[in-house]
From Swiss-Prot:
GO molecular function, one term: rRNA binding
Cellular component, GO, one term: small ribosomal subunit
Domain S4 RNA-binding: 104-168
Protein name as annotated: Small ribosomal subunit protein uS4
Assembly behavior: Part of the 30S ribosomal subunit. Contacts protein S5. The interaction surface between S4 and S5 is involved in control of translational fidelity.
Membership in a protein family: Belongs to the universal ribosomal protein uS4 family.
Stored HAMAP family: Ribosomal_uS4_A
Biological source species: Methanococcus aeolicus (strain ATCC BAA-1280 / DSM 17508 / OCM 812 / Nankai-3)
KW Cell membrane (keyword) present: no
InterPro entries the record matches: Ribosomal_uS4 (IPR022801), Ribosomal_uS4_arc (IPR022802), Ribosomal_uS4_CS (IPR018079), Ribosomal_uS4_euk/arc (IPR005710), Ribosomal_uS4_N (IPR001912), S4_RNA-bd (IPR002942), S4_RNA-bd_sf (IPR036986)
Length: 177
């Protein structure tokens, strides 16, 4: 089978490890979104950085190919619900912040939909296999949910959480059903 290739990191670490303000901001984000470690923040920052880098490159590119790439970038950002403006510009891409990407994670959406009481509980439900998207079990809390799949987030049908009488189910979900 051969040796698997060495996978490259999907994130960049901070340049300086002990900047108090950055540590404080990361702790607040970690608590707000129920993240388990700083690496999850760094992965999303890197993803945001690539979008912004591409937008900066496209601002200076006035060719037809640059126009096509800008339309593709807007398509990706619209598909994931990160940038929802119809008449978005590349300046709007540059003004995106980390929270706009963190809001599209499966863990955050499970909590926002009321399927879990806290972001940490949402993470636990996802990791333990209680959450499905379009009927398919997703066990990665960092899964970026496209807009078309957002309404299809639910409990797995064969999960104990699917039972209305389960003690861990939230009151808002019991009332909705």
């Amino acid at each position: 089978m051969g040796d698997p290739r060495r996978l490259s990191k999907t994130y960049d670490t901070p340049n300086h490890p002990w900047i108090g303000e950055r540590i404080k901001q990361e702790r607040e984000l970690s608590n707000k979104y129920g993240l388990s470690n700083k690496k999850e923040i760094w992965k999303m920052e890197t993803r945001l950085r690539t979008f912004r880098r591409q937008a900066r490159k496209l601002i200076s590119d006035t060719s037809a190919q640059g126009e096509k790439e800008a339309v593709q970038l807007f398509g990706i950002l619209n598909r994931y619900g990160i940038l929802l403006k119809e008449d978005a510009t590349l300046d709007d891409v540059l003004s995106l912040n980390l929270e706009s990407i963190l809001e599209r994670r499966l863990q955050t959406l499970v909590f926002r939909k009321g399927l879990a009481n806290t972001p940490k509980q949402a993470r636990q439900f996802i990791v333990h296999g209680h959450i499905a998207v379009n009927g398919k079990k997703i066990n990665a809390p960092s899964y970026l949910v496209p807009l078309v799949e957002e309404d299809a987030i639910s409990y797995m049908p064969n999960s104990p959480m699917a039972s209305e009488s389960h003690p861990e189910r939230t009151d808002s979900v019991k009332d909705a059903e």
